[in-house]
Amino acid sequence: MSTASSSSSSSSSQTPHPPSQRMRRSAAGSPPAVAAAGSGNGAGGGGGVGCAPAAGAGRLLQPIRATVPYQLLRGSQHSPTRPPVAAAAASLGSLPGPGAARGPSPSSPTPPAAAAPAEQAPRAKGRPRRSPESHRRSSSPERRSPGSPVCRADKAKSQQVRTSSTIRRTSSLDTITGPYLTGQWPRDPHVHYPSCMKDKATQTPSCWAEEGAEKRSHQRSASWGSADQLKEQIAKLRQQLQRSKQSSRHSKEKDRQSPLHGNHITISHTQATGSRSVPMPLSNISVPKSSVSRVPCNVEGISPELEKVFIKENNGKEEVSKPLDIPDGRRAPLPAHYRSSSTRSIDTQTPSVQERSSSCSSHSPCVSPFCPPESQDGSPCSTEDLLYDRDKDSGSSSPLPKYASSPKPNNSYMFKREPPEGCERVKVFEEMASRQPISAPLFSCPDKNKVNFIPTGSAFCPVKLLGPLLPASDLMLKNSPNSGQSSALATLTVEQLSSRVSFTSLSDDTSTAGSMEASVQQPSQQQQLLQELQGEDHISAQNYVII
């Protein structure tokens, strides 16, 4: 007995776990439970397993809570700092609590080091019995009360049990980093969530529904392995990738058919319909010029069928279009000879210009003043055609630069891959810029000579003429040799001067003051005006009218 108690005390001193001390305090607070536990352990003989038949009441089972450090110590038996025999002795010593002296029977005089493995086996047998007993203890009313110290100790011990169980399940760093560095993620065979390893950002909602169905089926049947699931998922992903590749190929083929996006596609479609059908509301010749020619058709993505249609119409339009007469003007204005000539070259349009001028000279002039001579094929003409033919007649081979789209007209004709009408527009712009100073006075309002001449002359003419006239009337009235003529002239000049002064009073005072100073400085002009006024009345009236 003394040896067992000393060994238990020494082993308990070796265990640094505070839950055993906490359990002793809680057990000391309930002495009848401790006595009952001691009697139960004594009745159990050499194993201390007699707690199982003493499970009649909840109070008698309280000391079994000391088995939690035993589980912790079992998890740490393989630690290098503690030998397995000492760990087993420590676990046995910390198990019964205050009734440890009564635990071993007096008929076993074995030393503690030898008795520890013998007692460990029946305790291992009694371990599965603790789980139903713990359920019974959790159903007891004393455990449910939150204020009791027993409940607090149980909470701490249950947390320790959870942490110890999770510590057992985790694998070492070598098992994790080894396959991870080789490119293989470690898989847990017991958990059925490898389907969740997909990223939902790359999946569609239909795939999410399939994943949910897979999860449910895998949870019900545990015979499914993770390898089968991964194979199915890989097959599904391959199918999805093939579908996406096919759709992307279709879209790329569509884009190859029309590499120039935007309005070029619509222009080509409208040209096709306009060339095939007679009622076409287009009346602008600048829209279909670009893509009618043979070589740029391949550049702009028009199919060879449309190209054949254009070529057939170019060949047979001169025969068909002459008997046709369309009064509504709904036909697309596409002259056949111009289209056939524009298909011959990419870089320059000089042959088309020559052919167009020759064809315009060969055609008979139209009756209507708004139609050019080329409108015999039944197509209505636009103002651009009219201006184009006027420029042809005047000797310039260019329409107006209304549609010149290049920002640098001097350099854009160097690009050989541009559409042919771009080259024509560049030429038009250069020639119009060179001819602009000749025809500028017809269109522009102010001239540089006139602008410089206005402040010195025309705007201030009446003010300068009124300056010498104001003192001239006084001189005429004072120094008049003939009274009759002077009175008539005086009445005429005073009336005219009063009307003139009333007109100039609305102007600036500075101008009148300047005119007065000018009249004082120029007396010779006053004498000349006196002679003119005395000479002839109508001459003075004409002078005022001219001013």
Swiss-Prot record:
Coiled-coil ranges from the UniProt annotation: 225-254
Lineage of producing organism: Eukaryota, Metazoa, Chordata, Craniata, Vertebrata
Annotated segments matching region Disordered: 1-55, 72-285, 319-417, 505-530
Name assigned to this protein: Glucocorticoid-induced transcript 1 protein
Biased composition (Polar residues): 265-276, 339-356, 505-520
Sequence positions bearing Phosphoserine: 20, 79, 105, 107-108, 171-172, 223, 258, 303, 345, 394, 398, 406, 412, 480
Transmembrane segments: none
UniProt keyword Glycosyltransferase, yes or no: no
Gene designation per UniProt: GLCCI1
Species: Homo sapiens
Modified residues (Phosphothreonine): T110, T175, T177, T266, T343, T350
Residue stretches of biased makeup (Basic and acidic residues): 130-145, 187-201, 319-331
Biased composition (Low complexity): 1-13, 26-38, 86-105, 162-177, 236-245, 357-369, 521-530
